[in-house]
Amino acid sequence: MGLPQIHRLKHRQDFQAVYGTGKRYHGSHLTLISLEDSCPDAPGPSRFGISISKKVSKKAVVRNRLKRQIRAVIRELLPEIAAGWRGIIIIRPGAIECNYEHFLRELKQLLVKANIIHGH
């Protein structure tokens, strides 16, 4: 099962807003760009987009597999994620060797660093 529609960042203007004014957090294989929604009184659900370039892999099969793994990680972390955030996860070259547990650990660290998940 994929990431629920309500938690997906899909529109070009949303991506541009996050890229333009979002704050960046870097990991070894992932980069998180996050932006808090402009209406803090009534925050909507947090939404995420995934970006992966052909530098990571020329093969679409490999890129799609990595995106599915990241979506599964986000879905697992959703109960801990605060409402009212937009984020883009950029998959960097070298992520091909990573497994699900590595992505889970790294993305959780990035979300804690961005205060989207409150650290333990």
Swiss-Prot record:
It is an enzyme of class 3 (hydrolase). It catalyses: Endonucleolytic cleavage of RNA, removing 5'-extranucleotides from tRNA precursor. HAMAP family: RNase_P. One of its GO terms (biological process) is tRNA 5'-leader removal. This is Ribonuclease P protein component. RNaseP catalyzes the removal of the 5'-leader sequence from pre-tRNA to produce the mature 5'-terminus. It can also cleave other RNA substrates such as 4.5S RNA. The protein component plays an auxiliary but essential role in vivo by binding to the 5'-leader sequence and broadening the substrate specificity of the ribozyme. PANTHER family: RIBONUCLEASE P PROTEIN COMPONENT. Coiled coil: none annotated. Belongs to the RnpA family.
